[in-house]
Amino acid sequence: MAVVAHLFHELRGETWPARLNTAERAGIDLVMLDADLAGCVTTWLSNGGSLDARRLGILCRKLSDLEQVLPELDEADNPGLWRLWHEMTRLIVDTGPYPTN
């Protein structure tokens, strides 16, 4: 949990490029991707490292979205921000345990 908290703190120092406010990469709306990731990660952190089944499902889908988006980014898209999201999401999804509800 400490690693994700550290990465999230690092992410908060990243700049959101204004050009992403209406951008899609690989057909994925980046504002919505960022918002969904933020909601799931902050909930995971607030809950001491656990997510309900619905949010875990969302996070798994967002991990797949990130893996499609990352190769499409250029430097003006601040790929460092998206790599941080990817690392946090992967760590949370890989951590388990998975909820039964």
Predicted feature residues:
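Intrinsically disordered, low-complexity regions enriched in Ser/Pro/Gly/Gln/His and often acidic
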Residues: 9, 37, 75-78
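Short, hydrophobic/amphipathic alpha-helical patches that form generic packing surfaces
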Residues: 33-44, 68, 84-91
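Amphipathic alpha-helical binding modules
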Residues: 74-101
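Short, extreme N-terminal segment that most often corresponds to the first beta-strand
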Residues: 1-16
